[in-house]
């Protein structure tokens, strides 16, 4: 038996009614196959009733593992429900060879900082992918993803940060209630999962080498104060690119050096978090190393559309003769109708590129996905976990 995915969504006025409608649709799509894992996404005002949604999904799907999260917006099918109440359910039957393990990440304050526990200890090569839901109010995400890169090297980690936290509650859900974990993960093995990260940013200007810096601070680019080099680079751009820069200055850092050419997928893109005019240093949202290649980037709707379409086409090619069983999506709350001028942009693109397929996910306050084989936290991205049958 192969992998089967079912999904459902409902905008019913109560969590129980919405969960019933969504879970019934997912159950029908499974076609009698057992549910190994069910994910529940609860949105809008219904985030105050997560236990009701979980109880109903448990009754209808009887999953071996039940996890979920609250969210400010939901993705289901060809639609992005950026606002309003709703429940989305995603269910997977892993077939004869697949297995799934749900794990919890917990943090503890220690004298030198924070200790992280809960990353699975498994043999190298045993894990196909990890889906990660991260409560960043309690989880240092960058440090956590570095730990994943160390303990599960090469394993794609895909997920998101809840964009709506219930009043006086926690956003992560497991079993029949809220979880106290800082992160919830699902580790899959024995099945094939393709990750996709569309940062939607276009490189502009010349490549620049970091010649002095440490931590997240770049002091020099190409042997000169970083702020001076960036100012000169912006001045040399054409008028259209300078206009895009006004919406936010972005810097891409090459993840895997030593290639003859670097394209959009080779950079981790970050905004500039600060600058010191006296020293000429700039601060970026990622660690830097001397010798690393950097390049200015711009983000605009056309670039984001083209990049997502290109990434989807690559995944379609990578599937070969295999069938896509379903997908989980995590897209930024800075995309959607505000960025593209119309609703459902990413969901429609995913269905056009890989579908029709069962698709569920959430509009996130941060996305998680691999670049250059390492997991990173992102903003303004569309990230996807594509499950093959």
Where are these regions (language model features)?
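Small-residue-enriched flexible segments
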Residues: 1-51, 56-59, 63-65, 69-340, ...
């Amino acid at each position: 038996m192969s992998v089967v995915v079912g999904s459902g969504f409902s905008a019913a006025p109560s969590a129980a009614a919405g969960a019933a409608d969504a879970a019934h649709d997912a159950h029908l799509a499974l076609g009698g196959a057992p549910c190994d894992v069910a994910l529940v996404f609860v949105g809008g005002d219904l985030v105050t009733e997560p236990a009701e949604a979980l109880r109903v999904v448990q009754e209808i799907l009887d999953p071996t593992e039940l996890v979920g999260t609250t969210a400010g917006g939901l993705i289901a099918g060809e639609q992005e429900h950026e606002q309003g109440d709703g429940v989305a359910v995603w269910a997977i039957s892993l077939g004869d060879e697949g297995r799934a393990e749900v794990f919890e990440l917990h943090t503890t304050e220690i004298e030198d900082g924070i200790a992280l526990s809960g990353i699975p200890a498994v043999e190298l090569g045993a894990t196909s992918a990890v889906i990660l839901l991260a409560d960043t109010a309690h989880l240092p995400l960058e440090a956590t993803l570095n730990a994943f890169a160390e303990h599960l090297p090469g394993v794609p980690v895909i997920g998101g940060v809840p964009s709506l936290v219930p009043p006086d509650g926690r956003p992560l859900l497991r079993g029949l209630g809220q979880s106290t974990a800082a992160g919830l993960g699902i580790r899959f093995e024995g099945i094939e999962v393709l990750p996709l990260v569309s940062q939607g940013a276009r490189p502009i200007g010349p490549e620049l080498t970091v010649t002095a810096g440490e931590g997240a601070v770049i002091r020099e680019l190409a042997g000169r104060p970083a702020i001076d080099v960036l100012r000169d680079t912006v001045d040399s751009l054409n008028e259209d690119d300078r206009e895009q820069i006004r919406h936010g200055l972005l810097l891409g850092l090459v993840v895997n050096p030593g290639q003859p050419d670097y394209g959009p997928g080779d950079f981790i893109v970050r905004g500039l978090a600060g600058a010191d005019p006296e020293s000429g240093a700039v601060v970026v949202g990622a660690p830097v190393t001397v010798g690393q290649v950097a390049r200015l980037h711009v983000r605009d709707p056309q670039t984001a559309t083209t990049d997502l379409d290109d990434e989807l086409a690559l995944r379609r090619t990578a599937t070969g003769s295999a069938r896509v069983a379903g997908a989980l999506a995590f897209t930024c709350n800075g995309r959607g109708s505000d960025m593209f001028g119309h609703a459902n942009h990413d969901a429609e693109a995913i269905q056009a590129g890989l579908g029709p397929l069962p698709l569920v996910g959430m509009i996130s306050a941060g996305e998680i996905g691999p670049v250059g084989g390492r997991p990173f936290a992102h903003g303004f991205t569309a990230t996807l976990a594509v499950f093959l049958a």
